């Protein structure tokens, strides 16, 4: 419980620093960074089962109008995720060269195919695997989960 509070505090602190302009991606990059955080970052280690996916997909607003078919939650602290942006650039799926890869703990949530929004249902798969994220800005921050 104390670890969760600490991680939540650190995330809140970072968001506050962003708001104060002390860590300053551009406005467009900031919006994309905030979206990345909302859709993909959950430092809790409680992921891994179907109930987790059902709850988190709804909480993070990915089931309002239609069921998002697939989403990955990264279970690492924000600094570990941001450090991926300092690794060697690799090519993204769209051909751009602003992607980076790292190995992290994740929960992949895949929609079952038989549910309808807003009552979407997901199957979970927890693993430690290689991920590819796109980063932008100065300093670079993650803005897109590529694979």
Curated annotation (Swiss-Prot):
The UniProt keyword set, sorted, is: Antibiotic, Antimicrobial, Disulfide bond, Endonuclease, Hydrolase, Nuclease, Pyrrolidone carboxylic acid, Secreted, Signal
List, from the UniProt record, the residues annotated as the active site of this protein: 40, 144
Q: Where is the signal peptide?
A: 1-28
> Which sites bind dUMP?
35, 40, 68, 71-72, 145
Query: What Gene Ontology cellular component terms go with this record?
Result: extracellular space
Q: Where in the cell is it found?
A: Secreted
Please indicate if the UniProt record lists Repeat as a keyword: no
* CDD domains named among the record's database cross-references: RNase_A_canonical
Which sequence positions carry the modification called Pyrrolidone carboxylic acid? Answer: 29
Q: What's an example of a GO molecular-function annotation for this chain?
A: RNA nuclease activity
* The keyword Acetylation appears for this protein: no
Under the heading Pfam families, the entry gives: RnaseA (PF00074)
Q: Which cysteines are joined by disulfide bonds?
A: 53-109, 67-120, 85-135, 92-99
Top-rank taxon of the source lineage equals Eukaryota
**Catalytic class of the enzyme:** hydrolase
Tell me, what is an example of a GO biological process annotation in this record? Answer: antibacterial humoral response
Query: What Enzyme Commission number(s) apply to this enzyme?
Result: 3.1.27.-
Primary location class: secreted
Q: What does this protein do?
A: Cleaves preferentially after uridine bases. Has antimicrobial activity against uropathogenic E.coli (UPEC). Probably contributes to urinary tract sterility.
- Spell out the family assignment given in the record's similarity comment: Belongs to the pancreatic ribonuclease family.
Q: What is this protein called?
A: Ribonuclease 4
> Native species of this protein?
Bos taurus (Bovine)
Gene symbol of the encoding locus: RNASE4
């Amino acid at each position: 419980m104390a670890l969760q509070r600490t991680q939540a505090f650190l995330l809140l602190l970072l968001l506050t620093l962003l708001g104060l302009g002390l860590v300053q991606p551009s406005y467009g990059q900031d919006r994309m960074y905030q979206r990345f955080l909302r859709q993909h970052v959950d430092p809790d280690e409680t992921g891994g089962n179907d109930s987790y996916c059902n709850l988190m997909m709804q909480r993070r607003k990915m089931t309002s109008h239609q069921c998002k078919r697939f989403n990955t939650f990264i279970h690492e602290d924000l600094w570990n995720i941001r450090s991926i942006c300092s690794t060697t650039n690799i090519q993204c799926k769209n051909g751009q060269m602003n992607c980076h890869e790292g190995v992290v703990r994740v929960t992949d949530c895949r929609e079952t195919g038989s549910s309808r929004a807003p009552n979407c249902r997901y199957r979970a798969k927890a693993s430690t695997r290689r991920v590819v994220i796109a980063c932008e800005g100065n300093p670079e921050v993650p803005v897109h989960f590529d694979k």
